[in-house]
């Protein structure tokens, strides 16, 4: 329980970390907002990813999800994933979803 609280606290600190240089770069936003749970390579093989059962972007079933649905999950959250709709612009969210597709390869 204590470990999950530490992970949640670190995630909360990182939520405010997107710099101006990363505003429209899907890769940069992913690295700052998503990689902690989903991993730099998209496998979700991280302590936070395991704790929160994060989706792996190497899973073909996950990647068959329509972009509109992925965008909705990023904006509104789902299960243990927090909502980022108030922290990221629509352009940033779309850029992250586009970047996630590059991790599938």
Model-derived segments and their meaning:
Residues 1-9:
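Bacterial N-terminal signal peptides that target proteins for export
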Residues 8, 16-18, 73:
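Low-complexity, intrinsically disordered/propeptide-like segments
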Residues 13-29, 45:
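Electrostatic cytochrome c docking/interface patches
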Residues 27-53, 78-80, 102-105:
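Periplasmic/extracellular electron-transfer cofactor-ligation site
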Residues 51-104:
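Extracytoplasmic electron-transfer domains, predominantly the class I c-type cytochrome c fold
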């Amino acid at each position: 329980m204590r470990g999950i609280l530490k992970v949640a606290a670190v995630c909360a600190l990182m939520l405010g970390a997107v710099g101006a240089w990363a505003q429209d770069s899907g890769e940069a936003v992913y690295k700052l907002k998503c990689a902690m749970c989903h991993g730099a390579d998209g496998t979700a093989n991280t302590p936070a990813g395991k704790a929160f059962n994060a989706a792996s972007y190497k899973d073909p079933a996950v990647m068959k999800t329509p972009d509109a649905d992925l965008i909705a999950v990023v904006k509104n959250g789902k299960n243990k994933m927090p909502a980022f709709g108030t922290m990221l612009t629509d352009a940033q969210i779309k850029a992250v979803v586009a970047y996630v597709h590059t991790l599938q390869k």
